Structure formats: structure tokens, C-alpha cells
Design a protein with these regions (language model features):
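An acidic/histidine-cluster motif and surrounding catalytic segment
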Residues: 1-86, 90-270
Length: 270
């Protein structure tokens, strides 16, 4: 399913890509924030909860985005089948078509309730750095790729993800009522909703943020303070230290799992 504003003008591009690969897909009209009336917005959104979590209000676009995806979760629940959700500015790698689309539903369901297939606002030129600084703590192999849990989960976008019926059930249950958080606040879905959120590596879905304008980002930038480059420079030594610790933990986990596997094999041989 592809979430798309009817007025966005983006549908032709992604429809051509999907049709080229013979993929069965449908567009779902996203809720248009520009059509909100003040009274309606107040009913659909809990500003106090949002400000308590983020220190700012959510934009009308962010609220509309959440409501749009919630409609899809309801469809997953009613159909009883998992779904891959894409936004209309998604760029798709070949592995999306040759691997991800043919993976068994039950195999993915054993790994998580939601599997993030990509990350918003990440350019391909920074892909290797992202994997280096944000390794998966624990992961399972599937078709030469990995699905696992990163050390840190954050608001990394919803440009592409897989969701199971169980995931849809949990998501709908804990987000019932007025919108009070960002759609892509994955730590919130994990902690408040009890959902298992995994990530695919390498990513197969990218956001065309460098070439396509976004209503949501334009609105959000007016409410979010910008940080200077000096801050990134000061934090770089901290990031390097954290990187070393994380990879040490990954190595320790791999050694422990290998030792456990070896012990199980010896026990079975007896």
C-alpha cells in the first residue's frame, strides 16, 4: 500500500516503478491537513501530551500523517494479513523487489511486529556511516540480509515498513483516541504499545527528500529549532566512543551465542 496525498503529484513516478516490476499495489489517499477545520483538529489531537513528550506542538501535517497510517493499520487488522506500507516519495532498491517482497509472512512475524525497511532523511552517501555508528545489537539472517534491533531507536521516519496483524492490533490499541505522538516515534510504540520494532539491514527503501519537496517538512521546520554545525563537531568524539562500545557489545553477544550454539550441538551429539 502506498500512502499519498491526492494533490501531491508524486503518484506517477512510483506507480511506474512498481508496474515495471510487476508489483500489485494500491494507493491510499492520505488525510490532507489543509482540510482540517479548527474544531476538528482540536478533537483529533492532544496537544498537552505532545508537548510533554517533545517540548513542542505537532504540526497539522504530522497529525494527518499519523491518522493516514492508522487507517492502514485498521485495514491490516480487518484483512488479517501483513502489509508493506510505503510513502509516495519512496525510492526502492532492487533487493526490495527480489527479496523483501517474496519473504514469507510467518518468517517476518517471528522476528517482529514491525520491520523498518528504510530511514527518512538519510542519503545513500551516508549509508555506510549509518551502519557503522548504529549497528544492530541482535539480528537474524534472512536471504543474505539481517533483521534485528539497533542500539537506539528514534523518530527515523516511516518511508517504508512491514507490519503484521499482531503489530496492527497493538498499534491501534495503544494509539486509540486523539493523536498524542509522532507516527514514527518508534521508542514510544515499543514502550507504550509493547510492540517489537525491528530494522532491516541493509536498507532497501529510501526517501527522496533531496529531490522532492515535502509539505510535512516545511511545516515542521517552522516549529523545530535548528542546531549549529559546531554542536555536531563537539559531539563527534562522544559518537566515536559510543561506536567502540557498541561494537564491543555486538562482538560479545556473537561470541556468547556462538558458544551457546556449540554447547547445544555437543549436548545433542551425546
Amino acid at each position: 500500500m502506498i500512502v499519498s496525498l491526492a494533490r501531491s503529484g508524486r503518484r506517477e513516478r512510483i506507480a511506474e516503478v512498481m508496474s515495471k516490476h510487476g508489483v500489485d499495489f494500491s494507493f491510499v489517499d492520505a488525510i490532507d491537513a489543509q482540510r482540517f477545520k479548527s474544531s476538528e483538529f482540536a478533537r483529533l489531537y492532544d496537544d498537552s501530551a505532545a508537548r510533554a513528550r517533545y517540548g513542542r506542538s505537532l504540526t497539522q501535517g504530522e497529525v494527518a500523517c499519523f491518522l493516514s497510517h492508522r487507517q492502514l493499520w485498521q485495514r491490516v487488522l480487518s484483512d488479517g494479513r501483513s502489509m508493506i506500507v510505503l510513502e509516495d516519495d519512496a525510492l526502492l532498491d532492487p533487493a526490495f523487489f527480489t527479496k523483501v517482497l517474496i519473504w514469507r509472512e510467518d518468517t517476518l512475524a517471528r522476528m517482529g511486529d514491525i520491520v523498518l525497511l528504510g530511514q527518512s532523511k538519510l542519503s545513500r552517501s551516508r549509508e555506510a556511516r549509518e551502519y557503522l555508528y548504529e549497528p544492530l545489537k541482535r539480528s537474524s539472517r534472512i536471504d543474505g540480509m539481517r533483521i534485528g534491533t539497533p542500539f537506539k531507536q528514534w523518530t527515523s521516519g516511516a518511508v517504508g515498513y512491514w507490519i503484521s496483524p499482531r503489530g496492527a492490533t497493538l498499534a491501534l490499541a495503544h494509539t486509540e483516541g486523539p493523536v498524542r505522538a509522532l507516527l514514527d516515534d518508534w521508542p514510544w510504540h515499543r514502550d507504550d504499545g509493547g510492540m517489537v520494532i525491528r530494522e532491516l539491514r541493509p536498507y532497501v527503501v529510501w526517501e527522496a527528500f533531496e529531490s522532492l519537496a515535502s509539505d510535512l517538512e516545511g511545516e515542521r521546520s517552522r516549529l523545530t529549532p535548528t542546531s549549529g554545525r559546531w554542536r555536531d563537531c563537539l559531539l563527534e568524539p562522544v559518537r566515536v566512543g559510543r561506536l567502540i562500545v557498541r561494537w564491543a557489545v555486538v562482538a560479545a553477544i556473537c561470541i556468547a551465542e556462538s558458544a551457546s550454539s556449540g554447547g547445544d550441538q555437543k549436548g545433542g551429539a551425546r
